[in-house]
């Protein structure tokens, strides 16, 4: 059974500016298991970057308790000496939107800089840097300067540098937001690969639910300093409860964009009185059921599929359909009940039930 490697309990972060008090994080509790890829999602100002900085005490909380790898590092106050905190921080790597590479140093020199106080010999450092650059796919770019690298390559150097001290945790704070979509996918694939190869726990800070959908297994949603929803990616995408979470997921799945086009179709604009426009959401075993065929077989209800999407989230198929159901009123009622009994979420978008 996995254990919690990061435990943030009842965290508050308050800033005092002149006569104003700003609460950036309010009473947030998050436990992250070892080996998780854990996404923290929210719009700008939600408090997600402030929250993640308390993990290594770059930001000290105003209240709460922080436990990292079974060591309490904060409980109302910092519980470690300066030297203990320095060593603990070596277990936590960080990458950011801006790569923060030293322009006058080569890729290998940038990575080696993180090993300055490692106690390794010159030969050991050189071997480790070579291994790290190979791990992130830059073995042939060791002697290149940042100006000779693309944005994605610069971020790979930053990742190699963050891994130099063999951390157990890697925090990614909007690390792909300055990259193009193709490069973003490559960096996310690299993070996923590192998670699997090294057993690395990855904490992703992002404002894009698509990124969470691509590689995370758990997600927390923040709004105005509060944690408003948390769970597995499968749970959250299958059944988002909060309006903000629903907005994020609609954007990530493309359903909002699809609905604009669907609503302009003649079959929808002039929906007949014996028809319903419905949205179906299903996950896991229910994706294997020939449900729409069964509706006609048992209820003589026809199904016209206008939109369909199926994705694999954390190893589980999750699907969404927009369908026009047509049939007699009693048959439509029976069909809706059968759909729900099959474990499929149904929402009537248009038509009289």
Swiss-Prot record:
Domain called ABC transporter: residue spans: 8-249
Superkingdom classification of source: Bacteria
Main localization of the protein described in the UniProt heading: membrane
InterPro entries xref list: AAA+_ATPase (IPR003593), ABC_transporter-like_ATP-bd (IPR003439), ABC_transporter-like_CS (IPR017871), ACT-like_dom_sf (IPR045865), MetN_ABC_transporter-like (IPR050086), NIL_domain (IPR018449), P-loop_NTPase (IPR027417)
Localisation: Cell membrane
Cellular component terms (Gene Ontology): plasma membrane
Ligand binding (ATP): 42-49
Pfam families on file: ABC_tran (PF00005), NIL (PF09383)
Gene3D superfamilies assigned to the protein according to its UniProt record, in alphabetical order: 3.30.70.260, P-loop containing nucleotide triphosphate hydrolases
Membrane disposition: Peripheral membrane protein
Reaction it catalyzes: L-methionine(out) + ATP + H2O = L-methionine(in) + ADP + phosphate + H(+); D-methionine(out) + ATP + H2O = D-methionine(in) + ADP + phosphate + H(+)
EC number(s) reported in the record: 7.4.2.11
UniProt keyword Transport present: yes
SUPFAM superfamilies, alphabetized: ACT-like, P-loop containing nucleoside triphosphate hydrolases
Molecular functions per Gene Ontology: ABC-type D-methionine transporter activity; ATP binding; ATP hydrolysis activity
EC class (word): translocase
Keywords (A to Z) from UniProt: Amino-acid transport, ATP-binding, Cell membrane, Membrane, Nucleotide-binding, Translocase, Transport
Family: Belongs to the ABC transporter superfamily. Methionine importer (TC 3.A.1.24) family.
Quaternary structure annotation from Swiss-Prot or TrEMBL: The complex is composed of two ATP-binding proteins (MetN), two transmembrane proteins (MetI) and a solute-binding protein (MetQ).
Function: Part of the ABC transporter complex MetNIQ involved in methionine import. Responsible for energy coupling to the transport system.
Name of the featured protein: Methionine import ATP-binding protein MetN
Species assigned in the record: Streptococcus pneumoniae (strain ATCC BAA-255 / R6)
Gene name in the database record: metN
